[in-house]
């Protein structure tokens, strides 16, 4: 059992707990498409979980799901969702619909850009830079979104946040990846980084998010996650537990939280998608990001 409590006044004070056990199938996350330069096919907005729009950012398909009255709320608070995919399987997917409804109902927009299986690589981060510019400068959204990482989306969210800590209001998600060595593994990640396995291994101290999480801790970026204790795809110990340990070692234990889902793996258990504590945290941080942007 792992228990953490938020103490900083700007956060919701959440007492965390271990959730129950439900069986679920492991998620297949082995697609290896690497970020490309060709113009991506733009999916129709009707394919989104909730009302919004789709658009291009430097040839990459992007989306935003908007709350009602978005034009009257400036700057617009928003959640930056990772991993966004428009080619099977699509993310965000239908399992997350209720969660995103909570975000939208709270007046928080949700947006993301498809950078393929970039695994947090510099090439993918360049697209993220352009997406951030589009959302904040061109569309008037808050300059500090809350990052959200699902599974390997954690690599994308954390790697960009580490390079742009002053532009991030918080980071949350469920069973997120922070260590390239476990998932996807260096063999699979190397092409996305445009390196050989040996080159990537040598560059891990400066490229692997888990080796650089101290940047977020020292910058005071709040974080909250839920992760299963029997996850064999993205292990708790190598990823979110390592995240927590880094925050603790850098004097930031009061701004990080983790719910350990007892008996859960890398699956579609509803508790991951309906975690009230995670949802409240993300809404709170996105809202604070809009306040800080004024």
Segments the model singles out, each with a brief description of its role:
Residues 9-21:
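Bacterial N-terminal signal peptides
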Residues 24-74, 189-192, 287-294:
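A domain-start/cap signature at the N-terminus of enzymes
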Residues 70, 181-248:
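The feature captures the conserved acid-bearing segment of alpha/beta-hydrolase catalytic domains
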Residues 73-84:
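Short beta-strand element of the alpha/beta-hydrolase
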Residues 91-110:
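Short amphipathic alpha-helix adjacent to the substrate-entry channel of hydrolases
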Residues 119-140, 159:
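Alpha/beta-hydrolase active-site loop
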Residues 136-138, 142-191:
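Primarily recognizes the serine-hydrolase "nucleophile elbow" in alpha/beta-hydrolase
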Residues 237-294:
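C-terminal catalytic histidine-bearing segment of alpha/beta-hydrolase fold enzymes
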